[in-house]
From Swiss-Prot:
EC number(s) recorded for this UniProt protein: 5.1.1.3
Chain positions recorded as substrate binding sites: 10-11, 42-43, 74-75, 182-183
Protein name per the record: Glutamate racemase 2
Catalyzed reactions per annotation: L-glutamate = D-glutamate
GO biological process, one term: cell wall organization
Pathway(s) of this molecule: Cell wall biogenesis; peptidoglycan biosynthesis
The species this protein was found in: Caldanaerobacter subterraneus subsp. tengcongensis (strain DSM 15242 / JCM 11007 / NBRC 100824 / MB4) (Thermoanaerobacter tengcongensis)
């Protein structure tokens, strides 16, 4: 047994969709969640900025004595060198690519993500490393994250943005669409309605949460015997984050702590 918490971080509220899946699979674990609400979105940031931000956040997580860190941000996964950190890191992008490979029947996979993730070609590279025959079609949807951060993921504006973005996949005959940004599952009902029944919409957090569980079991560092607790930290706006977190997780949150992340 190991009662140390699991760290989860994202540029904002998107990683809460990953946290929700983790809680479902590992309800007895404690969690430290960090949302970089001061510097969201990451999609248009430079490689150097994202590497700096990730280093600061991972240092913060180490100070919190976490036993593993879940990078719940595809843009970060697509940008940083994960090998340089001396802590167990879980990669939502890798889990998403693997899910897409195992879901597709016709070997035609779509990916929607931030501009930086698409430009990195990380999904395409990861998918083709498993099965080179799969055709990968990618589309950046930069309008999604600002809408979701404002809580407008069920709005008419969100529907219009999704319809415009997903138009790209018409005629491509994809049977699988990967939500390549952890914010996007909050728009999943809209995305599914637009894509129709013939396309399987993949949330990478489903596979990722089971990978974390398997690692904890294998390493014999599971926590058990009590209901887990969650501590929330942000770098900027705490009130909007608190509202969003309560909506996504379906539970009341007592406090969100603001941390000066740049000192790490």
């Amino acid at each position: 047994m190991d009662s140390r918490p699991i760290g989860v971080f994202d540029s904002g509220v998107g990683g809460l969709t990953v946290l929700k899946r983790l809680i479902q699979v590992l309800p007895e674990e404690d969690y430290i969640y960090f949302g970089d609400t001061k510097r969201v979105p990451y999609g248009d940031r430079s490689k150097e900025e994202i590497e700096l931000f990730a280093g600061q956040i991972i240092n913060f997580m180490k100070e919190k004595n976490v036993k593993a860190v879940v990078i719940a941000c595809n843009t970060t996964c697509a940008t940083i060198d994960k090998g340089k950190y001396d802590i167990e890191l879980f990669d939502v992008l890798k889990a998403g690519a693997e899910s897409g490979v195992y879901c597709t029947k016709n070997k035609k996979v779509g990916v929607i993500a931030t501009k930086r993730t698409v430009e990195s070609r990380s999904y395409e590279i990861n998918i083709k490393s498993i099965n080179p025959q799969i055709e990968v079609y990618q589309k950046a949807c930069p309008e999604f994250v600002p809408l979701i951060e404002k809580g407008l993921y069920n709005s008419h504006l969100a529907y219009k943005a999704a319809k415009d973005c997903l138009e790209e996949f018409k005629g491509k005959e994809i049977d699988t669409l990967i939500l390549g940004c952890t914010h996007y599952p909050l728009m999943e009902p809209i995305i599914k309605a637009i894509m129709g029944d013939g396309v399987k919409v993949v949330d990478p957090a489903v596979r990722l949460s089971h990978e974390v569980k398997e690692y904890l079991e294998r390493s014999r560092i599971l926590n058990f015997g009590k209901k887990g607790k969650i501590e929330f930290f942000v770098s900027g706006d705490a009130e909007n984050f608190k509202r969003a977190a309560e909506m996504v997780l379906g539970k009341k949150i007592d406090e969100v702590f603001i941390v000066d992340i740049e000192r790490y």
